[in-house]
């Protein structure tokens, strides 16, 4: 995994620590077996257009982005043992439940992952 930040296109940092899944195994594992994300943490998976919370013990907010980083869909507080997806998405960002709302994210926002 590579550590970076999630920024809005203007350059403002939204989430200080966002890990990017670099390989197929990391993408498949996702957050399984990992501790709950803190409010200042996230997990970027690309390519990815669906996620599940099977075997997880906590809820997540899920962002679906296209290749340009445009936010297409927000799934708030996806409970354990659920699935969600979006055919046209290229990447997902997983974050702690409630963070999408707390950050004021909206459909159409342009998001960028930047390495630290």
Predicted features along the sequence, with ranges:
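Compact, glycine-rich, soluble single-domain proteins
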Residues: 1-116
């Amino acid at each position: 995994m590579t550590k970076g930040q999630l920024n809005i296109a203007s350059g403002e940092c939204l989430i200080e620590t966002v890990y990017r899944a670099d390989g197929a195994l990391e993408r498949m594992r996702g957050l399984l077996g990992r501790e709950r994300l803190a409010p200042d943490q996230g997990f970027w998976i690309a390519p990815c257009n669906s996620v599940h919370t099977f075997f997880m013990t906590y809820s997540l907010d899920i962002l679906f982005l296209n290749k340009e980083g445009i936010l297409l869909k927000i799934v708030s507080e996806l409970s354990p043992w659920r699935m969600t997806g979006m055919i046209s998405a290229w990447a997902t960002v997983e974050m702690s439940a409630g963070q999408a709302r707390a950050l004021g994210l909206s459909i159409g926002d342009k998001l960028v992952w930047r390495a630290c």
